[in-house]
UniProtKB/Swiss-Prot annotation:
Pathway: Amino-acid biosynthesis; L-arginine biosynthesis; N(2)-acetyl-L-ornithine from L-glutamate: step 4/4. The modification N6-(pyridoxal phosphate)lysine is found at residue 284. Belongs to the class-III pyridoxal-phosphate-dependent aminotransferase family. ArgD subfamily. Binds 1 pyridoxal phosphate per subunit. It catalyses: N(2)-acetyl-L-ornithine + 2-oxoglutarate = N-acetyl-L-glutamate 5-semialdehyde + L-glutamate. This is Acetylornithine aminotransferase. Its EC number is 2.6.1.11. May also have succinyldiaminopimelate aminotransferase activity, thus carrying out the corresponding step in lysine biosynthesis. Its cofactor is pyridoxal 5'-phosphate. It comes from Bifidobacterium longum (strain NCC 2705). It is found in: Cytoplasm. GO terms for cellular component: cytoplasm. N(2)-acetyl-L-ornithine binds at residues 160, 313.
Length: 431
């Protein structure tokens, strides 16, 4: 028997999806639905079907949809000035940078670079790391030095632009674009011996490599299935970086801005081991749905390596995006949404296992970045079942579903999601 959603699908979705396929390059596949409007944690498609959104634009819509304070801030700024060139600055841009430095607990002299996406934030971090690498003794041409290296993790994801892609593990999206940026190497995530060996390859001899300028990692590897890297391992990375004068770059594109129950995931000792990074990248949730990303360089000496002309973007830190970012951070503070992320995430994880559904083997995650491990690789079938029953989730891996609800999600919203998850059939087909 068809569900209510199945019966209502068709007319408007079919019309718009047909046109979509005619005018859009096929980089995302066929969209699941054509969406029209949202409110809070709920969104409606063009056929009028309502969905509880437990993906939030992949951890982007921190405040859900149409939060009145966010809408007002963006509208007010648009009525003043939406964009100025980077020959000028704006008050929202300056205020947002100051606030991010403060929330990150970065030391005096730390500075922010704004871009428009997570990939751009990571591009900035990688470029700054390369500039830093040129200052290392083992990389100096005058003594026969070799180009400094950047180490990245297997299964890590940092973006699809050429530099960020060079530090992204997934072979399927890397290989078509070979050769990528040189001197970026992968080490097995969580493997201390492999990391030690990678550092130990530094040397001026015939078989030696250039010094390690930086290590880039995610504390929770989101695209790998919401897999925490491990606090003990991260602490070890920091120790090796310190010994070898290398930078630690923590990619918080998905984990930052309150999502894991702290403003930044590195502020959770159970994820970071209490380490402090040299750079943090951010995006997704920072502006509540407006395209924005960036990087924080910790300390004046590192931040000073970027000089006029060394990096930039036309739209970086534009007033409209900055106003959206300020409104997002203000609402997160005013409504205590960091604590809500912690509480609702615990409710979700505990509730999934309490459903008694034998399809659900285990849960993992922090705050409102979570995953459930499935008994067999049927994540796409589960995702489609949930969608048909009014719940948006993500098939992040064959055996795992990802949840990243807006930070404004309520206990009632979580209960509604759990009621749908409880009834997911156990005999759905494998992907």
């Amino acid at each position: 028997m068809a569900t209510e959603h199945e019966e209502k699908l068709g007319t408007e979705d079919s019309k718009w999806l047909g046109e979509y396929s005619q005018v859009h390059m096929n980089v995302f596949g066929t969209p699941l639905r054509v969406m029209d409007h949202g409110q809070g944690a709920h969104i409606w498609d063009v056929d009028g079907n309502e969905y509880l959104d437990f993906l939030a634009g992949i951890a982007v819509n921190s405040l859900g949809y149409a939060h009145p304070k966010w809408v007002k801030a963006v509208a007010d700024q648009a009525a003043k000035v939406a964009h100025i060139s980077n020959y000028f600055a704006s008050e929202p841009q300056i205020e947002l940078a100051s606030k991010l430095v403060k929330l990150a607990g970065a030391p005096e002299g730390s500075k922010v670079y704004f871009g428009n996406s997570g990939a751009e934030g990571n591009e900035a971090a990688l470029k700054l790391a390369k500039l830093y690498g040129r200052t290392l003794p083992g990389a100096l041409p005058s003594i026969g030095g070799k180009p400094a290296r950047i180490l990245a993790m297997t299964h890590g994801f940092h973006g699809r632009t050429m530099g960020a892609l060079s530090a992204t593990w997934k072979p399927g999206i890397r290989k078509p674009y070979d050769p990528l940026v040189p001197n970026i190497e992968f080490v097995r995530a969580g493997d201390k011996v492999a990391l030690h060996d990678a550092f130990a390859q530094t040397g001026l001899g015939r078989y030696g490599k250039g010094p390690v300028a930086a290590v880039i990692l995610e504390l929770i590897q989101g695209e790998a299935g919401v897999q925490p890297l491990g606090a003990d391992y991260v602490k070890f990375v920091r120790e090796l970086c310190d010994i070898n004068h290398a930078l630690l770059i923590i990619d918080e594109v998905q984990t930052g801005i309150g999502r894991t129950g702290k403003w930044f995931a590195f502020q959770r000792d159970d994820l970071s081991g209490g380490v402090t990074p040299d750079m943090v990248t951010f995006a997704k949730g920072v502006a509540g749905g407006f395209p924005m990303g960036g990087m924080i360089a910790f300390g004046e000496k590192l931040a000073a390596l970027f000089t006029p002309g060394s990096h930039g973007s036309t739209f970086a830190g534009n007033p409209l995006g900055a106003a959206a970012g300020l409104a997002t951070l203000d609402v997160i503070e005013d409504e205590n949404l960091v604590a809500n992320a912690e509480a609702r995430g615990e409710q979700l994880r505990d509730g999934i296992m309490a459903t008694g559904n034998p399809l659900f083997v285990s849960v993992r995650g922090r705050g409102l970045l979570d995953a459930v491990e499935l008994k067999h690789p049927c994540s796409h079938a589960v995702m489609n079942y949930c969608l048909e029953h009014g719940l948006i989730v993500n098939a992040v891996a064959p055996n795992a579903l990802r949840f990243a609800p807006p930070l404004i999600v309520t206990a009632q919203d979580v209960d509604q999601a759990l009621a749908i998850l409880k009834d997911v059939p156990t005999d759905l087909p494998d992907d």
